[in-house]
């Protein structure tokens, strides 16, 4: 029996002993069918307690660790561990997979939870971030994911009463989650003082936002919202592991072994202590509880499951037991009864009944048990222990007979001899000890040759010999009982063995794979009766082999279930069962053995899913006599589709070469040529490695592919239309059921599939991201909605797509060998079949994955390589064509029968309504009936059958057929030789198209006089083609060797051909018969050329580095050109026939003289003057520009110059054909490039009249014919030179505003940094010095004076409880655009500033706010579709910024989109239907993303441009077309499925137009697009071509454009001086031909508009300076609605001492006075310098302002006239104050000084004193109430007090304590230590202000937060309330005079916020 076939018998899993209780929780439930579901190892178990039966789910491939029950109580979700863990959802009735969720988690899936309606599933990963995911599990789609927590999460649960809310808990945390859009956001639970912060182990949600959770200390923590409201103490005395909620209430289970039941309000009902019951024991710990009606389930840490009936709660039933934690190795079966014994590291020995599936006895030992053995009569049991001792027990009462310890190391193997007289014990020390049973186990022998630990031992039948295996892989023999080694081979050979459990030896060598030395098979056991062997290995597999199993790499059957290591396998005494034990999963599996007679070659009727019963992957074949592969198939499997460089790598290469060569001075690059090319016709069809790639379209055209082109061929006109969307070889093609769309798949690193329309040739969808190397098979589903594709990666992945959306529905690994065909089931959209090398599999989609079953051959046939497959008309029939020529007929997965159809493989099959047509390697087409019972007709493809209308010749009779299709009364056939034929049903055949066969094509020559060319290829043929409208092959000749070059003689009569073996021939050009041949060289001939005119000489270049010159007339070699150091690549003659130009592989350009071959050195300048007959060389100064920047990778293979010397065509290794203007001097000339060939373009030639260019591709075998389009006649639809967009020289224009905006770097709050450069220790980190004179606690002294003067003593002291945002002055115009809109027919406007979205009512002026953003908002858009009224989208700066979509009226968030745009989102826009949203980021790639915002799904995403993109807008009538503009950037985008395709704007030859920086977009009818440029022009585009310019629409940049949807009028806004005719806002007609200008009355010299919006008769305008203005269209009157500061930080802020007014002073050089009550600007003054601080005088008459340049001014409030000014300092004035008695002015500066001025002396402002000893710059100053002191806070975090006006520092604490301050704005001092947060290391508290009532202090900080504290605030980290709105820095803050308002100013956001105090 030396065959390697798999055995015909099988195993079926019958029972699993065990339950996983350790490291898991909440994994035990009742199903709807009252069964119990749980898991153990890698198996999901459904246990029916009534019938005592188990069902198994085997879809996992590693340990299951989590389980959730669907609300319908039937579906189960399980999650596993592993490198790529997945989640299965399965049905507990039939244990079938319903859905698979994969490709997201790593390490493992720790928790699972279904939501209350069962639609969504939440999962938590075991990765470092404990990722939380939300799935639409039926679709297998990930909806959202987020970082869970930094530490383990133990439980997650949905809130059943609130949609989209979840709670998770774990190590020291609990989090409350909200799902909105695709954003999953968490808020941490607040433990507060109610309970200790501790680990929460489990939770359940209840009504009214209550959450119950079980804590580590045994308490129940009860939460309301986020806050811990109470604890139920001592619910358990130790950790609560499980909390179960049901209708009746709650059940909890804990580490204390108790179950407690609680009612729905969590009042206790009862308590059950399992430790106290009769099966209980000390240390019992409950991991899982479930309560259903009157029954409870409890799962314990030690793998037991208890069932308790509540009425009889003192009698729990133990319904399942298994071993506890610890490895399980020991297994033995009783020699006479169906009993098994196991022993484990849990120190127990257990006896199991195999017949009853029950534990009958358990015995606890002192030590871990590692091996067991029954004596032959079954009376005694020996146990080997971990400490090296062994124990013998009597079986009947489990009492000890002996306990012997002779060894130190663990005993891993022991066996009694068959006669019962000896016990052999093998230990890890190495020896085997032999003991005599009868002599009370006296040691009588020792076998000690092993150098390593003993793994297995077996006795001979007669008990005289022992064989051992050890850890070193040695197999040794000993005589018994002495232990003498036995070496004689003969003697060993004859020994019959009593048992076979050894893994080494000739009988079991087949269990080891070929060519490996592995040690991962732990155990085997032979069944002599049935000649089978069972094995268990480290991969969790149990396998069946034939026994004996002699040849390595034998086939087997394999069974899954154990997770990691199967430690032991044994047959039962009667061979009915196999038992296997799992190491880490410590479970025991009992398998039923189904002998061959029973299984009778037919697989079980219900093969288990997940390929559980499978023939193993590795052992695909059942038989060893697999025929060798057919040569064609063999050849095909060897093809390698890897590329050194993929097209996708080009941008990177360009980038790298840019970085390397950036030092090169930028010379003017040569211009691209005016003329262009159009691909007209391609000769070729890819048949040699593709199949089923030929179809009729709806219109009766033929569609197929060659190279990177899909061809739609018209039979009547013999013309081709070409789809050129691919950039590398197409490998597969399929047609939509309606026959109008086609899908094609290509080669690539990330291989793409295009779905395109055969009429328009437009790409409808581009599918990427899931295949590597290439896509080798495609098929549409029967309804045409889905597409399935198969990749060329190592696993041949299968991907199922919703192709219109471009989303993958499901994926799976296909097979390890190549898959040739995939087919969708016509009746069931979710079923597929694949065939390939030794493979047929039937697939069923399950959620995001597939389950598969292999074809089961039974006795009807055997496993073959399948080449084609088709579904029949009857429901479950499948027909597959095999490599043997047979057709296999399948029903479901069973093979019914086979039918012989062809000689050699059946490559093609096509199903008809009533039958099939097949084609094979034998070149015969056969028509069959619908069950392959009769062959109705055959057609042999022969030359004699060809009709006269054929467009070519058959290369040979009976070519191998690779594709067949029927339609239009014909059979269409594609052959391996690259021919396409149409067979009429009556017999005649027409050849439509043909090309070269497999092999590279290099040789190409154009006829000197006629439209004819010749090609020669490695396929060993020379072919002559006609190029007129006939496009056909005229002649073909087979050669003995492949050829690489050919050339016509000048008269066109002779044709020279150079071959690969160093020979060449000259043939007659008409008959292609030999004229002469030579063989002078060994290496291949690389180029061959006749000299001009008479063609006297023939030059022959070879890879031997020589060029031979022959005299044609005498047929002799006359000269040899030597001197090249490498192989010759190209040669050209000069026009006199005297000089040869030669290029070599070492990039040498050499010159030789004919006929002798003398070498000449010619200077470049001279060489340029020589007139050459032909130019095919690629070197020299006139070609320098054709080499690309990254030419170290790519080579230019060929070039050819037109006869007039103007146009040079080249072909390169990237598949590009390029046109250059000749001469091509200087580096990197511009060009036009064309795609079509796939990898290498090997040769290019112009036809004799220069009107046509011919190109051949190397491996793609194609001959392409391009027509030259002269400048005038061009169709302008050209892909122009790609390179030109990167040129530095054409900069896109300049404007200071745009330049500044480009340079803004958006950093975020996350990196919050101090806005001031402070130094020193933060106040809350300073150590306090204890002063000597601390007052005694009870002081007899007078009471301390107030800290703060109370201004309004009369009123009741009012405490401020809350702040509410009331109004914002500001609008972000300086770096945003189009961020201002009308709402509600012009009643409201919406805009943004800082982090606030603002809706302002125009009639009342009141504002409402959207404050959910966490940082500056950068963009805002309003949905224009009536269905989504008032829906607004905004987005922001941030490392992971979110887009918020919200309702402008209610301010409800409708959806949140977490983005990939790092740094921020700077533009968003809704599509025409309002359902899609496009966003663009400020990340380095400027990614453009399209979203389906309501679901929160990303539709597509792609890098937009390397520089800033300013605007991206959908066409107002489209959901797929949009336009982006930016820095030198103009792209027209199409959304195709889930891919974004773009066309660059083509400027063409318009005068005065060049690619500018574009700033804005508007749209017109008929596909018109208008873009505003930086120079003030508006460019008008039709499709993507520029058609005209609106010159100088504005004098400066056109920043904004608005298209009015209702009448199509366009508003533009830009930078312009207001004049009579011109203005910064203009209203245009629909075509932008006429306009009307509006002046904005802002008083600025140049107005700069950033945003416009048109309402009814009004235009809303936003300016760069932060104003919002409304302009009437009729009256042209402008009305300022919002006034804000311009760009620049606002630092100065002061509130009026008695009125509701305040002043703000900003770096924009203005000071503005505002009215708090009416919310409006009262007055403003331009100061001429940036202002830093401001202060009112106590009487409110004057205001002092300090400037950044050291100057200060005093203005009169009413007139804002200057009262006085002074400049005594050079650096910024930081704070300024007027004393309460109106006498002194204090001025604090950056020069570490405070200067005092006496105001009573009039406007001279003489300094009367100043403070010295200030350690750093001044930040805040406050006067005392009596004007005698001033407190100064400084940049060194120190506060000092000085006398006024002398400036002397006050150091006595006593004095300072007693001062009453007039105001408090200091952030320093003990009184305010509590305002400093813990996380202030990067950021500071900038400002503070205490209320006039002295009870509260409000602060502003670098995080943009306002915080409200009580005052004084002397405890560190005091409690506070926080308010958002500002973006990064709050610079200053003040209470109004009566504490009604707080005013705060922003740093970066240039906004003033007014808050109401409540």
Swiss-Prot record:
Gene3D superfamilies the UniProt entry points to: YVTN repeat-like/Quinoprotein amine dehydrogenase
Record's keyword terms, sorted: Cytoplasm, Cytoskeleton, Microtubule, Repeat, WD repeat
A cellular component term, taken from the record's GO annotations: cytoplasm
One Pfam short name: Beta-prop_EML
UniProt biased composition (Acidic residues): 615-627
Principal place of residence: cytoplasm
Localization (cell): Cytoplasm, Cytoskeleton
Disulfide bonds: none
Basic and acidic residues composition-biased segments: 1322-1337
WD-type repeats, residues: 59-100, 104-145, 148-187, 195-233, 235-273, 280-321, 323-362, 364-403, 406-445, 561-601, 725-766, 770-811, 814-853, 861-900, 901-940, 996-1035, 1038-1077, 1080-1120, 1191-1230, 1236-1276, 1412-1456, 1460-1501, 1504-1543, 1553-1591, 1593-1638, 1685-1724, 1726-1767, 1768-1807, 1880-1919, 1925-1958
Region span, Disordered: 604-627, 1322-1352
Function noted in UniProt: May modify the assembly dynamics of microtubules, such that microtubules are slightly longer, but more dynamic.
Family: Belongs to the WD repeat EMAP family.
Protein name: Echinoderm microtubule-associated protein-like 6
Lineage of source species: Eukaryota, Metazoa, Chordata, Craniata, Vertebrata
Name of the gene this protein is made from: Eml6
